[in-house]
Swiss-Prot record:
Location in or out of the cell: Cytoplasm
Gene, per the UniProt record: blaI
Protein biosynthesis recorded as keyword: no
Designated name of the protein: Transcriptional regulator BlaI
Xref: InterPro entries: BlaI_family (IPR005650), WH-like_DNA-bd_sf (IPR036388), WH_DNA-bd_sf (IPR036390)
Length: 138
């Protein structure tokens, strides 16, 4: 996953809509869904979708008459990528460790339990992904 930036409010609303659908959506479909909650121009939604496509967050599918858009990554994968990118901003391992400690101090009991389970699976060798920042073979 490429380096990510935090999503703006409208980008997040567009992504939330796309994640809630099983089929790729046209600009019109996204516009109609979002316009029910806020006043938006069709061209604004189109621009946001095009920018999300340039960021490789949505896939632009060309149909006969309209473009359809689908998320490239699931919500969980995108959020995890944002967290890894934020952690990578630390200059050294000591700073990364301190950032992790501050993060863990702020999570709730359910999230802490999920972290414990994930770490236990990773230590048991059942993790399905390399640790963040680990080199991968190409």
């Amino acid at each position: 996953m490429a380096k990510l930036t935090r999503l703006g409010d409208l980008e997040r609303a567009v992504m939330d809509h796309l994640w809630s659908r099983t089929e790729p959506q046209t600009v019109r479909q996204v516009h109609e869904a979002l316009s029910a909650r806020r006043d938006l121009a069709y061209t604004t939604v189109m621009t946001v979708l095009q920018r999300l496509a340039k960021k490789n967050l949505v896939l632009q599918i060309r149909d006969d008459r309209a473009h359809r858009y689908a998320p490239v990554h699931g919500r969980d994968e995108l959020v995890a990528g944002l967290m890894v990118d934020a952690l990578a901003q630390a200059e050294d391992s000591g700073s990364r460790q301190a950032a992790l400690v501050h993060f863990v101090e702020r999570v709730g009991a359910d999230e802490a339990d999920a972290l414990r389970r994930a770490l236990a699976e990773l230590e048991a060798g059942h993790g399905n992904r390399p640790p963040a920042g680990a080199a991968t073979e190409t």
